[in-house]
Regions:
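Fe-S-dependent hydro-lyases/dehydratases of central metabolism
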Residues: 1-300
Length: 300
């Protein structure tokens, strides 16, 4: 609808958004990543919790993330209903940008840094809402249902729909249980998968492939699992290949692909079959999103 209006008028109707500050305190433990942070936030606030808001992410755990981790968090703000998400610029931002192809040249660099510093939120800024998340006890998070807010820690029991007080949540959980074939009290550990997919705009960056390759080194994909690695851009693909990461994936049994959206939205032949389960680094697990309506997606 908005595309139609823009083409017809050259304008878009937009309202001023509220700003919600999300402070992620503490530090992430081993095996816990930026994706786990944003899945936890969506679990706590809901898939509609950010409607009418922009999310500002801060706190110790966010400051400790590298730039690509911050990008992963901001990327999924929309999955929580927010119009946008951002992290205030700091030295991590500037180090990431400096020397890149489209970054300001050395003669203009200091001028741009001064400008970026000027648009940071003030130390005494007032927000429409402030939410706190504790990263110290955060575990790897996975979705158990059919939207990005139906999330649990990987070793945490899946919630019982009948124990939910909210009628809307209860109905949504019942639908998810039927689709995902769950039983109350089970965990996602041991939930068999048929397909493993690493890539997309959420987790298709160089740092993602470096970390996955580190874990894969010396291991092999099960013969019954179809595994794909799809870099998020051609730049990422060439960087991975320059470091030899593609060979690690191939030797482990992954298909190494050119950049693209691939299984995120069942592009071309990269489609989930009926009854298949996919472990996916993407951002959406809606019914039919990745292929057959009877396929099941687990985000992680």
């Amino acid at each position: 609808t908005q595309i139609r209006d823009v083409l017809a008028t050259g304008c878009i109707a937009a309202e001023k958004q509220k700003v919600r500050r999300i402070d992620v305190t503490g530090s992430l433990g081993d095996g816990v990543y930026a994706k786990d942070v944003i899945l936890k936030i969506i679990q706590d606030l809901g898939v509609d919790g950010g409607v009418g808001h922009v999310y500002e992410y801060g706190g110790e755990a966010i400051r400790e993330l590298d730039m690509e981790g911050r990008l992963a968090v901001c990327n999924m703000s929309i999955e929580g209903g927010a119009r946008a998400g951002y992290v205030n610029p700091d030295e991590t931002t500037y180090e990431y940008l400096k020397g890149r192809e489209y970054a300001p040249d050395e003669a203009e660099w200091d001028e741009y840094v001064d400008y970026w510093e000027s648009i940071r939120s003030d130390d005494d800024a007032e927000y429409d809402d402030v939410v706190g998340i504790d990263a110290d006890g955060l575990a790897p998070m996975v979705t158990w249902g059919i939207n990005p807010g139906q999330v649990v820690a990987v070793d945490e029991p899946i919630p019982d729909p009948e124990a939910m007080a909210d009628d809307t949540a209860r109905k949504a959980a019942r639908k998810a249980f039927d689709h995902m074939d769950h039983s109350p009290g089970n965990t996602m550990q041991g939930y068999d998968v048929d397909v493993a997919f690493l890539g997309t705009c959420t987790n298709g960056r160089l740092s993602d492939f470096r970390e996955a390759a580190r874990i894969l080194e010396g291991r092999e994909v099960d013969d019954d699992v179809w595994a794909l690695a799809v870099p998020g851009s051609e730049t990422v693909r060439t960087q991975c290949e320059a470091e030899g990461l593609d060979e690690v994936f191939r030797e482990a049994g992954f298909e190494w692909r050119r950049a693209g959206c691939s299984m995120c939205l069942a592009m071309n032949d990269d489609s989930l079959g009926a009854g298949e389960v996919r472990a996916s680094s993407s951002n959406r697990n809606f019914i039919g999103r990745q292929g057959d309506k009877d396929g099941r997606t687990v985000l992680m």
